[in-house]
Amino acid sequence: MTGDLARMSEMPGPDAFLRAVPLTSGIAGFAAPPAPIGVVYAIAGSSSRVLLDRASIGALCDDPDSVVAAAGQVGSQVKMRVGTTWLVANVRSLKLEDNAGTCIAAEIDFLGEGDEEPLTGNLDRFRRGVTRYPMPGCEVFPITTADLQQVYAAEDRANITIGTVYPTTDIPAALYVDPMLGKHFALVGSTGTGKSTAAALILHRICELAPQGHVVMIDPHGEYAAAFASNGALYDVSNLQMPYWLMNFEEHCEVFLTSSGSARQFDADILAKCLLAAKAKSRLGQEIAKLTVDAPVPYLLSDLTTIINAEMGKMDRAGDTAPYLRLKTKIDEIKADPRYGFMFSGMLVADTMASFLARIFRLPGDGKPISIIDVSGVPSDITAVVVAVLARMTFDFAIWSRNEPQRPILLVCEEAHRYIPAGQEATSAVGRILGRIAKEGRKYGVSLGLITQRPSDLAEGVLS
């Protein structure tokens, strides 16, 4: 019994495990954890600074783990231990800190945190956000492939895989679809960096995940037709057949008015009066008790020019007819120009809004949930109006059907800076409607995707 008591007194106390050497250091098959490569120098909520030892980083270049070997590079990640938690941060910039060249200062942005796995010391159960920041002087470590797998692990939520996480070859790069579309998204980059390829891949994956979804892509250069030949409906000037009467009054003004300054307002008043009279002559217009100039009511362009002529005949002085002549001349030019036939053909007056929306929004989808609207053949002076009508129809359709089962729609605009340039988003119809979708679209199930090579030229309010 005395021997048993003696042996019991030799058993480790509760603190012995804390003082013990990590189990992995004595078990074959477990790699020793990487040594620290620097220390935390300054901490701030938005951006922090660490000092990296150049020699320590150089010693990792030949590490068999490609993630560890890339430690310290711009775009790589580092980690810091706070209690039993690992904090993970992105390296944003680097510069030499001393004349000897032994110390590198790095600006970092925190990604999130995860628990420290007791056996291996690796990162576990990563989550976005930081609850406790490290103190200056805290050691900085390189992350490993196992850590990176935790950072980019896809949870049990709808996601699409678009590639692998660099510098690994086996960690899938996944995007959560609902957060991406619910908050809108933008693809930005200089010419030749692969924006169009990335956009095509993302849209393909979304269509595979949700084949009954609805995607409308505005394609200004005819780049996407080949990419979606099998699962997309392709529309260009030969088959778009967008009825001109779908335009609201603001869009009519952008197409028909050629004047500026005070004369433009006078011309707009004349157009409003004549346009309302032309819509009132149609059968549908006669059935509407309170017809407005914005109502999408079919009307004949010939009726509009006839009414303009009649109003012009009431003028006493020849000089007073100039605004009417400007309007009539512009309308006649558009009617006679075959380039505008996709929108201003007299045959389109018989179309209905329901049939046009069903075609563009793929209702039903018939295995082709995406519509590619190729506007490369559209005359440049009305391209913005065509995009404005499509965007407004998308938003209005979502509002009109909000009491029905929701049909989420994704509207993607390539070369977005052409339609919503910085400082001018409030002066054009397309700028206003895309801005409204960016601010309010998610309430009604409309998502907006913007692709641009000039983010600085894009309206700041929309991009934010």
For the regions a language model picked out, list residue spans one by one.
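Glycine-rich phosphate-binding loop of nucleotide-binding enzymes
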Residues: N159-M242, L458-E460
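Conserved catalytic network of the ASCE P-loop NTPase/AAA+ motor domain
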Residues: D178-M180, I206-P211, L363-G365, W400-P405, ...
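Loop/turn-to-beta-strand initiation segments
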Residues: Q212-V215, G367-I370, Q406-L410, K443-G449
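Conserved ATP-driven motor cores of ASCE-family P-loop NTPases powering translocation/secretion/packaging/pilus
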Residues: T258, A429, R436-E440, Y444-S464
